[in-house]
Amino acid sequence: MTKINSGILGTGHSYPEGILTNADLERIVDTSDEWITSRTGIKQRRKAAPDEYTSQFAVRAAREAIARAGIEPADIDLILCATVTPDQILPSTGCLIQAELGAHKASAMDIVAACSGFLYGLTLADSMIRCGQSKHALVIGAEILTRYVDYTDRSTCVLFGDGAGAAVLGAVEEGRGILAARIRSDGRYEEQLFAPGGGTKGGFSAETIARGDHFFKMRGNELFKVAVRSMAEISREVLEEAGLTTTDVKLFIPHQANQRITDAVASKLDVDSSMVYSNIAMHGNTSSASIPIGLDECVESGKIQKGDVVLMASFGGGVTWGGVVMRW
């Protein structure tokens, strides 16, 4: 059987027009621009309008990625949508995206891996392409997180923003594409970042709403330590598997959770700040959308050129984490 190499053929991203600045948050919660910036690096985040929903941004990002890949929606045979903020419980957001795109030949599903969702999707799509089960896979990270934050809790409401990013994967020439990909999870840390309401365990009632059970809960100090360790370790693992070191990496795109986390991971990997991409100041934490948005911004700006080695690492609720290294 002929060996198939899988790589990214096209990228895209989309986010709401609405912007929520630190100054806006100062008026609704006990915080300040200085407090937010010094602890997170965030200056503003995108916020969806009440009549906007996750799949709209996913579809816009997907259309960009498909066009840049030089294919048609009908050529897509696999859609993986990473999200923790779906349009609705049933059907999956992936199926809604499929219908809107007209990608009627595709299998579609959602991935619930929080901030690691996009790298989970890349890893699964890479495997499907390599084994011949898919020719063109669409991987999307899309979120409207601002609907799930408690605007009386300054530890969480300042962090999250909305948006979507997408990538089309397909066969590429030998020596290019995804060189190594790994994903991990550890459910023992479930309560470091979670939302207890809305499921069959926590339920959905006037009481759960009054308690704020549908909002994100986070234990920031504990999460920081596990996130830094896990992202650094899995970055080293994928580099070793690919026969590379950090000196080979042209660009490092970590999940945009918090600037302090990004800086700490970069320090552990001993990589220069000039090769670390950060857009958290303008977008905040967009969970599964953060890496694909960052990736597309780097493609659009010319930060990534053919032959460049790009390293991506993520960490999210679950807890989950992942690492992917590729040659563009």
Task: Identify the residue ranges that each predicted region occupies.
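Condensing-enzyme catalytic core mediating Claisen C-C bond formation in acyl metabolism
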Residues: 1-50, 153-225, 229, 233, ...
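Conserved beta-ketoacyl condensing-enzyme motif
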Residues: 8-10, 50-109, 119, 241-268
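A contiguous, well-structured pocket-lining segment that forms one wall/lid of small-molecule binding clefts
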Residues: 209-280
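Beta-strand segments within the central parallel beta-sheet cores of soluble alpha/beta enzyme folds
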Residues: 36, 75-82, 109-112, 135-142, ...
